[in-house]
Regions:
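Transmembrane beta-barrel domains of Gram-negative outer membranes and organellar outer membranes
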Residues: 76-283, 293-381
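Intrinsically disordered, low-complexity segments enriched in proline/serine/threonine
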Residues: 5-6, 44-46, 72, 92, ...
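Residues at flexible loop/coil and secondary-structure boundary positions
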Residues: 286-290
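N-terminal secretory signal peptides that target proteins for export/translocation
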Residues: 1-52
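Sec/Tat signal peptide C-region and signal peptidase I cleavage site
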Residues: 69-76
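Bacterial N-terminal signal peptides
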Residues: 58-66
Length: 381
């Protein structure tokens, strides 16, 4: 069903073009996979992965083309807000990567409180030059408490307090069945110990980090401020403080400073698109690895308003790698997280987010699977 409104024709043409592009990409990629699959991997596995990548690429192109469709500015509506998530790789999440937040600041006296629970399951192993080794086998559970308040003249400020637990978790069997059901590769998860915790990093034959017992506590606290530049455009700055214990990967041991811009526009009366770009200055971390001075992140978020109280969402977050000169898979490439789910309005003040996460495009750079449930309450003055 097409969204109603005067811009339905334009959106229909863009959507039709997207599906044609997606089909051509799949045909082209599958032809390539027939050669690659015969020499390296089973052709069915390679073609399946390339189909997914063709779809994701097409969605990104669709979001870009949407900029040229006649649109109107979005009114502030919390059901259109992005998912609050970043790359949950335990060696990356310790840094202060800004999250994709709303492009609208709260009005004077308006406040919003959130409580979220997320689980991310990791299973990655890699060896390089026989002296570099990394094992990321475990789960990260995070209880996030956040609060922000509007101060007038387009200003708002807030705080984020994470409570983190690193453990063996409980999702391994479920994820193995999930991958079997959809014919997805296990990556060795089904051959390893179930619900075990093993975080280990060796560089040059020297152990730099090891965690095999459960660790929990307060993570790095984030303070942020936002300024509305215009309708649908918001500038935010934030600082991450070293309040988490780096020995348990609850924090980085350093102070990071980030700057981000969030942008939102209506595609139609039911479709909304938003984007985010950010840069973060990293301080020296506890692992003692050679780090990049700056990390960049991009976010793209697409919303479909099914009903006045329900919206479905698709979001893709990318980040540049934070470590230099480390050829191990989880560190060597940019990270990507594809999130899909929705938001339901419970009352005039309350709403609930539920979404799932997969690692795309580089499977080893982000958790294999995750989900988040977040409750939010917005109080008017």
């Amino acid at each position: 069903m097409l969204p109603p409104g005067s811009d339905s024709k334009g959106f229909y043409l863009v959507t039709k073009w997207f599906y044609r592009l997606k089909h051509r990409l799949e045909v082209s990629f599958i032809e390539r996979s027939s050669t690659l699959g015969s020499t390296v991997f089973p052709s069915s596995l390679v073609s399946g992965k390339l189909k997914v990548r063709a779809t994701v690429f097409g969605l990104c192109v669709l979001a870009s083309v949407a900029l040229f469709v006649p649109v109107k500015r979005s009114h502030a509506d919390e059901l259109n807000e992005p998912f609050s998530i970043t790359n949950q790789n335990p060696f990356v999440r310790i840094f202060g990567l800004p999250r994709h937040r709303s492009s609208e600041v709260l009005s004077v006296g308006e406040s919003e409180s959130k409580i979220g629970y997320s689980v991310s399951s990791n299973y990655e192993f890699d060896v390089s030059n026989s002296e570099n080794f990394i094992a990321i086998d475990g789960e990260t559970e995070t209880l996030t408490l956040s609060y922000r308040r509007g101060f007038g003249n387009g200003w708002e400020a807030g705080i984020v307090l994470p409570l983190i637990k690193q453990s063996g978790g409980y999702l391994d069997r479920t994820i193995i069945k999930w991958h079997d059901w959809f014919g997805m590769p296990q990556g060795g998860r089904d051959q390893g110990p179930i619900d075990a915790l093993n975080y280990r990093l060796d560089i040059g034959g020297i152990n730099r980090f090891s965690l095999a017992e459960r660790a929990s506590g307060v993570g790095d606290v984030v303070l942020f401020a936002g300024k509305s530049l215009s309708s649908g455009v918001n500038l935010r700055s934030e600082i991450k403080l070293p309040s988490g214990n780096e020995a348990g990967l609850l924090g980085s041991g350093g102070t990071d400073v980030g700057l981000s811009i969030d942008y939102t526009r209506d595609i139609s009366s039911r479709w909304v698109w938003s984007a985010m770009v950010s840069f973060t200055h990293l301080s020296s971390g506890a692992l003692g690895l050679d780090q990049e001075r700056f990390v960049a992140a991009l976010g793209s978020h697409l919303v479909y308003r099914v009903k006045p109280k329900l919206s479905l969402k698709l979001q893709w977050d990318l980040n540049s790698r934070p470590y230099k000169s480390v050829s191990l898979g989880p560190f060597a490439k940019p990270g990507g997280v594809l999130s899909f789910g929705g938001t339901v309005r419970l009352t005039d003040q309350d709403r609930l987010d539920l979404f799932f996460m997969e690692n795309l495009p580089h499977n080893e750079t982000a958790p294999d699977f995750g989900f988040k449930l977040e409750f939010a309450r917005r109080i008017q003055k």
